[in-house]
Amino acid sequence: MEEIQRYLQPDRSQQHNFLYPLIFQEYIYALAHDHGLNRNRSILLENPGYNNKFSFLIVKRLITRMYQQNHFLIFTNDSNKNSFLGCNKSLYSQMISEGFAFIVEIPFSLRLISSLSSFEGKKVFKSHNLRSIHSTFPFLEDNFSHLNYVLDILIPYPVHLEILVQTLRYWVKDASSLHLLRFFLHEYWNLNSLITSKKPGYSFSKKNQRFFFFLYNSYVYECESTFVFLRNQSSHLRSTSFGALLERIYFYGKIERLVEVFAKDFQVTLWLFKDPFMHYVRYQGKSILASKGTFLLMNKWKFYLVNFWQCHFSLCFHTGRIHINQLSNHSRNFMGYLSSVRLNPSMVRSQMLENSFLINNAIKKFDTLVPIIPLIGSLAKANFCTVLGHPISKPVWSDLSDSDIIDRFGRICRNLFHYYSGSSKKKTLYRIKYILRLSCARTLARKHKSTVRTFLKRSGSELLEEFLTSEEQVLSLTFPRASSSLWGVYRSRIWYLDIFCINDLANYQ
């Protein structure tokens, strides 16, 4: 990366942005495949690898072939094997696409590193560990007391391939690199398989994943930039101050000041308080836009976005892909949670001189609940219980050792508690723990050809409690002097940044 930074110094990159010559450098492919000195992952996607087929000999042959006049003959040849190179052409195309994806990421990486270094005092932040899922945590923890409606948006697809090239022109000003990108899109890959998924989330083939995700993230960035533009255009009423004073429980006061606003050639005096105009979050192929506006205003936003995307991306985007829902009476499945907004009532007694009176306040709070029915369905599909939630034994694990059986059940339980640690109500998880605990006991009893009660009396109940309560043990070690408030800490919502790494139940056989 240091050699790349020397090649793309700020003054040179601003004047030329010549990225095309880098595709003929061997170290680019070493960095792209994590076989060089730099073992860092891409900021956009973790490198999937090439099944140990990468070697510098293949890279040298590839670069030699590209220097020839008809070096792209390996792509246009109908046969799977190239007679001149004697190697699978898909491997060469995959190597070139991975190297090209790494090259076009360089301007983004350098710009991100420079911005983060200036912001954090020359301390580079490891942003390759962050995903779009992490932006949902502050969204779910934000204050929704002033929001009324929400737009559930499915990101538009498909997009014309030339639009992708035009989008990258604002970032990569090297014409040769753009021509090479256009060649990749139109000559090698199927034109209808890039971003044409009929599901809310997008999935790509294992080959060329890095390149596909780079194009998709660039496209999503272009879509999301429209929200910034629309927000700036709609915020023509300037506001200067806002204050939240916590006097008692759920008591909030707003400081309002006189603001002078110039609009349509005449001066208007308005009383305003500054409040967030919209809340936006995206995860996979869905995005949510929450606002404090009325239904009529949200409907205007809906048609504005539809018309804007149709004109900007030259695609047919139906209004049915954007749904307007009221926060107070609508629940949605989001990130595996059943999310809804509920009113949290609070009663405060106030006394003035000899008279006392009660004040009833209702605060909007965003709830993230555990979907118990889908979870039981997943456990039933994996043969841990019946469809009604009655625990059963898992015969396919009876041949394993006792420690392996306990470890598998414990890992599933810990993963579920770890993922749903951000739930507002964790009582549902204890029903899942009961199912897994009893299923584990029945599996062990089946293995030893005894009943559950006999097995527990012989081995002791501590054997199951030891691996199923690791979450409480971690909290007790973290807060050793606060055992009395341990239950309150455990009930609070905790968001872990590594929840995207947790495997699904389908991965356990």
Curated annotation (Swiss-Prot):
Intracellular or extracellular location(s): Plastid, Chloroplast
Gene Ontology molecular function: RNA binding
Keyword field contains Amino-acid biosynthesis: no
InterPro entries in the cross-refs: Domain_X, Maturase_MatK, Maturase_MatK_N
Assigned keywords, A-Z: Chloroplast, mRNA processing, Plastid, RNA-binding, tRNA processing
GO biological process, one term: tRNA processing
Transmembrane segments: none
Function recorded in the entry: Usually encoded in the trnK tRNA gene intron. Probably assists in splicing its own and other chloroplast group II introns.
HAMAP family cross-referenced by the UniProt entry: MatK (MF_01390)
Family designation: Belongs to the intron maturase 2 family. MatK subfamily.
PANTHER family per record: MATURASE K
Protein name according to UniProt: Maturase K
Organism: Nicotiana debneyi (Debney's tobacco)
